[in-house]
C-alpha cells in the first residue's frame, strides 16, 4: 500500500466528519436557524440518553463473546494506557500553558480520549481491503478487524463515559464554584490574566475564611464519593456498555437477540437502528457549535498546538513502545492485525463524545468546537503517516 492510497483511506472518515460538521454549521446560521442553541441542547440530551447507549449495546452484544474478551485481555489495558498517558500529558499542557479555567477539563479530556468509534470501524476494514495488506486473507481480515474495531469502540466508550465524563464534569463544577466565589469575572477572563481577580472584596474574604473552617467529616466524604461513582456507573452510556458486555458474554442471552433465528432479534435491530443516529447527531451539533466558536471563542493557538502535539506525536510514539514491549513479553497474540489496532488506538483524533459532554454541562462548548476543527483537519495526514509507520513495523 502506497502513501497516497493510505492517505485516501485515512482521509475518508475525516472528510465525512468535516462535511457533516459543515452542514451542522449551515443549519445553525441565522439564514437557516434550524440548529439553535436550545435545539442543540435538546438533541444532545437525546444523544446522551438514547443514541449512545444503543450504539454501545448493539456493537458489544453482536461482536464480542466471552472467548473474545478472554483472548483479547490486553486490549482493555492498552486503551486504559492511552487514557492514562494522554491524561498526564494533557495535565502537563494545562500546567505549561495556563489556559482559561473552564478549558482545563476539556484539554485533558481531548488529550486522553481518542475517537475509537466510527474511525476504527472505517479504517481497519479499509486497510484489510487493500492489495498488499500484510494481514492475510481479505475476507478473514475484514471480519476479525471489525470485531477488533467494535471491541475497541466499546472499551473506548466505557472509558470515555467514566474517566473523561468525570474530567469534564469536575472542571465544570470547579469553574462554577470559581464564578460563585468571584474569582472569575466572566468566561473570557482567567485568574492569572486578570490582576484584580485574585483581590477579593473584604466580605468575600470573610465568606471564604468561614468556609475554610468548616471541616467535612470522613463519613460525608466517603458518602459523596460513593454517590459520585454510582452516578457515573448509572449514566446511560455506561449502562448500555455493561448490558452489551453481559449479553455478548452470556450465550443464552446472546442467542435471544442475535442471529437470524433469534426469537427477539427485532430488539437488537431496533437498538441498532437507534444507535446509528449517534454519530450524525454528534457531528451536526459539533458543526452548530463551531459557528458560535469561530465568532466568539478565543482559544490560544498554543493550546491547539499542544493538543495536536500530544495526540499526533507523543501518544503514537508511546503506543509503539507499549505494543512492542507487550509483544516481546509474550502478552499479545501473534496476529499482526491485533497489534496494528493496538497501535492505532494511540494515534486517533479526540473522541466526538467530548463535545456531547461540553454541551451537557454547558462548559467550553465553543472552544471545544474550535479545538476539534483543527485536530480533525490535521488528522488525515497524521493517521496516514502513522498507519504507514505501523504497517512497516508489522510487515
UniProtKB/Swiss-Prot annotation:
Compartments where located: Endoplasmic reticulum membrane
Keyword entries, A-Z: Auxin signaling pathway, Endoplasmic reticulum, Membrane, Transmembrane, Transmembrane helix, Transport
Residue ranges that the UniProt entry lists as topological domain Cytoplasmic: 30-45, 95-106, 164-232, 294-302, 362-369
Chain ranges on the Lumenal side, renumbered to this chain: 1-8, 67-73, 128-142, 254-272, 324-340, 391-395
Conditions for induction: Up-regulated by auxin application.
Pfam families recorded: Mem_trans
GO biological process: auxin-activated signaling pathway; endoplasmic reticulum to cytosol auxin transport; response to auxin
Membrane topology, record value: Multi-pass membrane protein
Tissue: Expressed in seedlings, rosette and cauline leaves, stems and flowers.
Main location, first listed in the record: endoplasmic reticulum
InterPro entries: Mem_transp_PIN-like, PILS1/3/4/5/7
Transmembrane segments: 9-29, 46-66, 74-94, 107-127, 143-163, 233-253, 273-293, 303-323, 341-361, 370-390
Any one Gene Ontology cellular component term annotated for this protein: endoplasmic reticulum membrane
Function of the molecule: Involved in cellular auxin homeostasis by regulating auxin metabolism. Regulates intracellular auxin accumulation at the endoplasmic reticulum and thus auxin availability for nuclear auxin signaling.
Family to which the UniProt record says this protein belongs: Belongs to the auxin efflux carrier (TC 2.A.69.2) family.
Entry protein name: Protein PIN-LIKES 7
Lineage: Eukaryota, Viridiplantae, Streptophyta, Embryophyta, Tracheophyta
Gene: PILS7
Amino acid at each position: 500500500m502506497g502513501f497516497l492510497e493510505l492517505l485516501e483511506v485515512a482521509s475518508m472518515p475525516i472528510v465525512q466528519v468535516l462535511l457533516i460538521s459543515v452542514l451542522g454549521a449551515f443549519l445553525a446560521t441565522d439564514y437557516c436557524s434550524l440548529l439553535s442553541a436550545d435545539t442543540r441542547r435538546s438533541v444532545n440530551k437525546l444523544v446522551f440518553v438514547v443514541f449512545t447507549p444503543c450504539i454501545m449495546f448493539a456493537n458489544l452484544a453482536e461482536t464480542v463473546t466471552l472467548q473474545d474478551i478472554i483472548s483479547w485481555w490486553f486490549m482493555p489495558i492498552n486503551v486504559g494506557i492511552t487514557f492514562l498517558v494522554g491524561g498526564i500529558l494533557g495535565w502537563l499542557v494545562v500546567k505549561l500553558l495556563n489556559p482559561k479555567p473552564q478549558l482545563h477539563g476539556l484539554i485533558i479530556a481531548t488529550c486522553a480520549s481518542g475517537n475509537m468509534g466510527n474511525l476504527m470501524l472505517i479504517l481497519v476494514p479499509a486497510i484489510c481491503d487493500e492489495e498488499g495488506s500484510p494481514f492475510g486473507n481479505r475476507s478473514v481480515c475484514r471480519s476479525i478487524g471489525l470485531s477488533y474495531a467494535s471491541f475497541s469502540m466499546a472499551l473506548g466508550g466505557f472509558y470515555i463515559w467514566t474517566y473523561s465524563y468525570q474530567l469534564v464534569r469536575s472542571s465544570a463544577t470547579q469553574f462554577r464554584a470559581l464564578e460563585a466565589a468571584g474569582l472569575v469575572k466572566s468566561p473570557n477572563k482567567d485568574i492569572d490574566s486578570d490582576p484584580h481577580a485574585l483581590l477579593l472584596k473584604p466580605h468575600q474574604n470573610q465568606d471564604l475564611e468561614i468556609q475554610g473552617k468548616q471541616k467535612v467529616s470522613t463519613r460525608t466524604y466517603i458518602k459523596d464519593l460513593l454517590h459520585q461513582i454510582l452516578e457515573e456507573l448509572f449514566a446511560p452510556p455506561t449502562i448500555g456498555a455493561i448490558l452489551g458486555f453481559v449479553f455478548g458474554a452470556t450465550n443464552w442471552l446472546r442467542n435471544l437477540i442475535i442471529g437470524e433465528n433469534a426469537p427477539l432479534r427485532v430488539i437488537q435491530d431496533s437498538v441498532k437502528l437507534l444507535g446509528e443516529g449517534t454519530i450524525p447527531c454528534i457531528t451536526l451539533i459539533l458543526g452548530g457549535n463551531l459557528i458560535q466558536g469561530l465568532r466568539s471563542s478565543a482559544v490560544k493557538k498554543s493550546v491547539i498546538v499542544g493538543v495536536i502535539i500530544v495526540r499526533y506525536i507523543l501518544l503514537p510514539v508511546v503506543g509503539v513502545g507499549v505494543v512492542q514491549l507487550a509483544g516481546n513479553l509474550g502478552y499479545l497474540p501473534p496476529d499482526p492485525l491485533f497489534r496494528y489496532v493496538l497501535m492505532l488506538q494511540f494515534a486517533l483524533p479526540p473522541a466526538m463524545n467530548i463535545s456531547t459532554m461540553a454541551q451537557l454541562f454547558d462548559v467550553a462548548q465553543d472552544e471545544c468546537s474550535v479545538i476539534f476543527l483543527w485536530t480533525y483537519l490535521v488528522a488525515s495526514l497524521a493517521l496516514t503517516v502513522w498507519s504507514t509507520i505501523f504497517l512497516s513495523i508489522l510487515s
